[in-house]
């Protein structure tokens, strides 16, 4: 009897500025990141400078509505932490000659947590505050912004776990010199769980002081729209917690039998049944039965072919059967998704 145990633990911390390839590609070759005096140059890939100058910028929460990629890099702090833990256990034991028992167990757990912080100096934060400011285009009167001044913190976490448990019997034997038989049969049980949470955005966030502010009119709901600075209907981003949970369970029964005579002629049969927690009122729809039969002729070992020098290997094989996978992306029943939101006033 032999046994083995393997454990794996990984952790990866990553910190980036969140600058995308798109931001680089939108930067014209002639544009500078810094002026000669060391101040930030205005990059033109977001708003037209001439149009901005027509607005009463001095009345807005942020009179500086310009974008600069270097300023974004310095003002962002995007952190991601990924952890993975895996345990694998194996056991193999011989029962009688040619017959052995094989057991495999694996458990794996992973998590991914992110915190994206855009400081008050970033265009992302300043643009949100200004864009969500009440504005009368005719009188150029500026009202209250629905988002408080300060940085923006976005965070969330995804957790994934699974286990796989397999029991299998293997049989291999040869007898009477010309007969070979191999067979296996087993059962495999598995479960996959995924849980994800996206937290509400934290507005007016100051990383150094660890303080934040609540929007003056509350977060509202995901359908509570209003007119933003540009006169378009808008809702406050990240006002609600998003939560998801999924559990997939599977069980499989399988067998495979092969027979070879004189090393030339072979036959095989395999069958498998895959079941899952598929949403259905008909239990038969939760199972996917599959099978196949096959035959093989090793022509290369026949006497009439051995004298042909340019043929050193030749097999003729034929199989027939039904194959596939458990389908869980749809259902014969009407599925309902339920969500909720909080309307803060």
State the predicted function of each range.
Residues 1, 87-93, 167-171, 255-261, ...:
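Residues on the lipid-exposed face of transmembrane beta-strands in outer-membrane beta-barrel proteins
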Residues 2-84, 102-104, 108-249, 278-284, ...:
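Surface-exposed loop/interface segments of Gram-negative outer-membrane beta-barrel transport/assembly proteins
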Residues 103, 251-257, 265-273, 288-297, ...:
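Extended, hydrophobic alpha-helical segments in both membrane/secreted and soluble proteins
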Residues 242-246, 254-259:
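An active-site-proximal beta-strand-loop segment
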Residues 90-100, 177:
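Short, solvent-exposed loop/edge-beta patches enriched in aromatic
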Residues 91-95, 255-271, 276-284:
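Conserved catalytic-core segments centered on acid/base and nucleophilic motifs
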